[in-house]
A protein has these predicted regions:
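Carbohydrate-binding/catalytic loop surfaces
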Residues: 2-12, 60-84, 135-176, 228-244
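Aromatic-rich carbohydrate-recognition surfaces in CAZymes
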Residues: 13-40, 47-147
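Helix-rich catalytic cores of soluble enzyme domains
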Residues: 106-108, 114-166, 170-188, 192, ...
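Short, glycine- and charge-enriched coil/turn segments that flank and shape catalytic ligand pockets
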Residues: 2-3, 34-35, 202-208
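Catalytic cores of carbohydrate-active enzymes
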Residues: 54-58, 126-143, 177-179, 189-244
Length: 244
């Protein structure tokens, strides 16, 4: 419908925040066309709505449905198809918004829902800097170990590093160590873009919050995300728990 774009992924009639972004990025070159612009702004509106429904989910239904493809605990909202928390799920809508904004200069997507979604993303990333205090749990029965989180749904223990925790990778497989470095770098960048949008929306407090969080994540990667390889020297780790 006008102002609302729902993009299914493959043969699954659900929308992933990550996949829906990737599925329209190649249309940005045509975003000067009104119909394409409407499609992208409709998707940004739907992504913001989904984040406000549940920022820890990775995939959503078009409409509420009590059908669940998996036996997950705790049971997710009827709007949610799957509730695997992945950092990049929250980064991708901001990534799309920034690319669209840079290409067109349009700001019609900067709605109150988008504003609230930005604040939600920043709040979740900050919460997950100290995962021990997080409300998020995820357990799935009768599945491979990569489809569930150990430790009663909390995942393996992690130390505080300044980075933000992720339950799952972009592949939807569970993180072995809670700090997924590439996704933290993605978050670092998109928080800077979020700060720009926050200022466009007149929210200086949110802009500063996003910038502070971005700097903390960057410092965390510098301190805990590097490894000295005997052959290749200083390289970035893929994942770390910050525990040495």
């Amino acid at each position: 419908t006008k102002g609302d774009t729902f993009v299914i992924t493959g043969d699954i009639h659900a929308m992933w925040l990550r996949d829906s972004t990737a599925q329209v990025m190649h249309y940005l070159r045509f975003a000067d066309d009104e119909a394409v612009a409407e499609l992208i702004e409709g998707l940004l509106a739907r992504q913001a709505k989904n984040i406000l429904i549940d920022p820890y989910a990775n995939a959503y239904n078009r409409e509420p449905s009590d059908y669940k493809p998996f036996d997950d605990r705790p049971r997710a909202s009827d709007w949610v198809w799957e509730r695997k928390y992945e950092i990049d799920s929250l980064c991708n809508p901001i990534h799309l918004a920034w690319a669209y904004f840079e290409k067109t200069g349009r700001e019609g997507f900067l709605t109150e829902d988008f504003h609230r979604a930005l604040k939600t993303v920043v709040d979740v990333f900050e919460t997950e800097q100290n995962h021990a205090d997080s409300p998020y749990r995820f357990q799935r029965s009768s599945c491979p170990p990569s489809d569930t989180l150990e430790n009663d749904g909390m995942g393996a223990p992690v130390a505080r590093t300044g980075m933000t925790w992720s339950g799952f990778r972009p592949s939807d497989d569970a993180c072995r160590y809670g700090y997924l470095v590439p996704s933290n770098l993605f978050a670092m960048q998109e928080l800077r873009h979020a700060a720009v949008f926050a200022r466009r929306l007149g929210d200086e407090a949110l802009a500063r919050h996003a910038e502070t969080l971005s700097a903390q994540i960057e410092e965390g990667v510098k301190q805990y995300g590097h490894v000295n390889h005997p052959k290749f020297g200083d390289i970035l780790a893929y994942e770390t728990d910050g525990m040495g």
